[in-house]
Amino acid sequence: MKIIDQMKDEKLGSAILYNFTLGYGKPVPMELYNYVLPFIFHEAFRANVLQATSFRNCIELCYKEDYRCLDAFKAAIIQDEMVTSKSLGLALVNRWLSFSVTDEKMSGTAHESTVMMLNEPYRLGEWFKEMSIEEIEECLVIERERIIILETNSIGQDMDLSKYDRLGDVTVYPEVEEEEIPILIQDATIVVVNKTVLNEDNLKNARKLKLICLFATGYNNIDLNYCRRHGIMVANVKGYSTPSVAQHTFSLLFYLYEKLPFYDHYVKSGRYSRDTSFTHFEKYFNEIEGKTWGIVGLGDIGQRVATIATAFGANVIYYSTSGRHDDARYERVDFDTLLERSDVISIHAPLNKATYHLFDQTAFAKMKETAYLINVARGAIIVEEDLAKALVDGKIAGAGLDVLEQEPMAKNNPLLAIRNSMRLVITPHIAWASVESRTRCVEEVYLNIESFIEGKGRNIIGHDLQ
């Protein structure tokens, strides 16, 4: 059928209509011929027709590749009428087809000929034999999902979301105010958010809503109880940020551990240019090799950090906040033991009742004064006032934070009083946000929506899609 890509005329059309008539297996109503060439001339339809299980399934496959195909089919049914008419005339002249009138209705019948066998129109004939024109046209009507994507600035302006247009009618809002949410989502069937809070107050008028997708793993901003009561599915994304968060864990540590703020300032202030020695190590630093690295939460990210820390020669121990993780490669200890033995502690646990304010003044008092604390998990795992005091009092050597209990950071956060960047470094929740990580996140959400539309369900939280 590659010849169709170069030709769209009555000679080829007559061969297509002849094969269609053979597949139909009985006299073809004349008006039905107008529905043949528009589909066979369509590249995606031809590519799918032999593998599809039905005409509707073939349309769905085409729609999945390009939702605009429905409009293309409808337009072609009108535009190709002349080609169809000429093709039928040529088939009549060549005696491939003949036409007769029965009960005041004209129909076409195929005769023996040397016309090349074309499988695609033959299959279409087999399908149409069991369908009325009304049923054919019904297959060309697919109700599109109404997809609302909120706070797209949180995923990055460099991310291309145009692919989502394949899934439905998409409206994007870079930023939203809380009071706007009920109006923006009231007609949505699918809503995508990152950190926007969705609860009964702003969901109660979204009566068409079927799915909430998160550009995130955590879902504590979604009222799951309300969603369950109203049949709204919630889907998150998992594992997309593991490489990025693990990388940022070490970025925060190295910044502190090797006293990089001091040495960068030393050079740029001109002191190095005035020095008489080729080296200057006024602020002493150590190697990771041989040190004990304590991990709180040995999930995917915790395991990735453990692997890298081991490669640096560290001795890894871990505390499982859930009690579910048991990894024979590393020593499992209780929380107090981890605090007492660790030279570096990195937090990779979820926020829950067991981890809320886990690191308080009691915990800091048990840590080594030379220890560093890294938190790339959830801000509320640390009591920030207690951490600030521990840093000021020298209870620990330093802390690297990518998360805070309140985000954006509160203006009166006690950590802002610590100006020494060798003791404390804070980044604005960016550990997850490498270009590659955000690209994976966007793709994962796309797959979650696609799977839901297909009735399969993917990454559904709390209950399965039946």
Identify the residue ranges that each predicted region occupies.
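Glycine-rich, aromatic-bearing surface loops/beta-hairpins
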Residues: 113-142
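Short amphipathic alpha-helical interaction segments
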Residues: 78-93
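Rossmann-like dinucleotide-binding domain for NAD(H)/NADP(H)
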Residues: 234, 370, 376-466
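N-terminal glycine-/charge-rich "phosphate-binding" loop or analogous flexible N-terminal tail
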Residues: 143-188
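Phosphate-binding beta-alpha-beta segment of Rossmann-like dinucleotide-binding domains, i.e.
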Residues: 238-292
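Rossmann-like adenosine-cofactor binding region
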Residues: 199-202, 321-414
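Hydrophobic/small residue at the entry helix of a nucleotide-binding pocket
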Residues: 301
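A short, conserved structural fragment
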Residues: 89-103
